[in-house]
Amino acid sequence: MRKSPGLSDCLWAWILLLSTLTGRSYGQPSLQDELKDNTTVFTRILDRLLDGYDNRLRPGLGERVTEVKTDIFVTSFGPVSDHDMEYTIDVFFRQSWKDERLKFKGPMTVLRLNNLMASKIWTPDTFFHNGKKSVAHNMTMPNKLLRITEDGTLLYTMRLTVRAECPMHLEDFPMDAHACPLKFGSYAYTRAEVVYEWTREPARSVVVAEDGSRLNQYDLLGQTVDSGIVQSSTGEYVVMTTHFHLKRKIGYFVIQTYLPCIMTVILSQVSFWLNRESVPARTVFGVTTVLTMTTLSISARNSLPKVAYATAMDWFIAVCYAFVFSALIEFATVNYFTKRGYAWDGKSVVPEKPKKVKDPLIKKNNTYAPTATSYTPNLARGDPGLATIAKSATIEPKEVKPETKPPEPKKTFNSVSKIDRLSRIAFPLLFGIFNLVYWATYLNREPQLKAPTPHQ
């Protein structure tokens, strides 16, 4: 019996439709299962990477030198301690290297991991040469980041707070500038095994955040990077160095030290305008200003380390102290000559009272009696000459006027000393010249940034 062609076509259409629907129904669950198994794929990749991995061995052991590329992002810089010669810095410290043992193939090109994986693989033993104390942040979890690319390149980032040494040369204090270094390198691997390089060009290898400065007495001018080799008893090591350039702000010290010193010197010179006979007033001026300068000198040194050399501020205070002390010595000199000498100005003359001349007559009972002995001549012979002498001897004596001498000019005190007149001009002039030379020298001087050779 022959089948109808229309029925057979219809049957084949139904079979194709059912097969298509069946295939879709079976395919949809398999795609969902694949998406759900991504975590399984990650786990399998990590397990395969760590299978037989020895984190005690550096990458390329026995074949090549391990290159570690680094860069730093500074989130906070400061404060800086002059007394301890150190500074504090908060950074994101990034290191990148290649480990062929960690190559993988999978649906992803980068594995984004945390600190748990970092503890299972080899990482550089980087330490800070001039670090006094370094802290890795652990709240709420260790602040570490790990990225592994499919070609085995790793990026390892951690957040650190480092308190590092900053050798300071304070000869120009407080107009000084410093280059505070941050030095790091491998602790155990010599340059024949591990070398460090900057990830980018020097200008971009170390970046400071715009709001990262935490400095009150300094301006952060910028930073420079460098690298070098340090020789030690165990070999040669690569050391990466970053210098942060600081310039001190002088405003605080002008208000706290310089202006009080200048005003004290000016106050000491006021005594030149007082009379040299004003001993108590001038003594108070001299002693008070000397004690004030002593107090200022002591307080200015409290915020600085005990260095064996004189700073620019020490020189200024010393000169001011010399001016104040010289003003006191000047008064002592004037007072010395005032007691032992007179200076006649030719104008002030005190008339001298007339001196009484001794009267040849003796005053007795309010009457004058001649001091000569009276005798009676013998007139018996009748000599007319003798009679005349006798007559004259009996005449009453007349009153004798005292002799007077013309008044002589008397020497008087001159209240203004020649030394005072000279000091009124010389002291302010010399102090002004000193200030002009001092400020012109230190403000226009280029700072000498010295950095000692690092050592291990």
Swiss-Prot record:
Please indicate the ranges of residues that lie on the Extracellular side. 28-253, 302-311, 442-456
Q: Which amino acids does the record list as binding 3alpha-hydroxy-5alpha-pregnan-11,20-dione?
A: 273
| Outcome (variant: residue 269 to L) | Reduced potentiation and activation by the agonist alphaxalone
Keywords carried by this UniProt record: Cell membrane, Chloride, Chloride channel, Cytoplasmic vesicle, Disease variant, Disulfide bond, Epilepsy, Glycoprotein, Ion channel, Ion transport, Ligand-gated ion channel, Membrane, Postsynaptic cell membrane, Receptor, Signal, Synapse, Transmembrane, Transmembrane helix, Transport
Q: Which GO terms describe its biological process?
A: chloride transmembrane transport; gamma-aminobutyric acid signaling pathway; inhibitory synapse assembly; synaptic transmission, GABAergic
Instruction: List glycan-bearing residues.
Output: 38, 138
What are this entry's molecular-function GO terms? GABA-A receptor activity; GABA-gated chloride ion channel activity; transmitter-gated monoatomic ion channel activity involved in regulation of postsynaptic membrane potential
Say which domain of life the source belongs to: Eukaryota
- Record topological domains on the Cytoplasmic side: 275-279, 334-421
Q: According to its UniProt record, which reaction does this protein catalyse?
A: chloride(in) = chloride(out)
Give the family per the record.
Answer: Belongs to the ligand-gated ion channel (TC 1.A.9) family. Gamma-aminobutyric acid receptor (TC 1.A.9.5) subfamily. GABRA1 sub-subfamily.
Name the record gives this protein:
Gamma-aminobutyric acid receptor subunit alpha-1
- Source organism (scientific name): Homo sapiens
Taxonomic path:
Eukaryota, Metazoa, Chordata, Craniata, Vertebrata
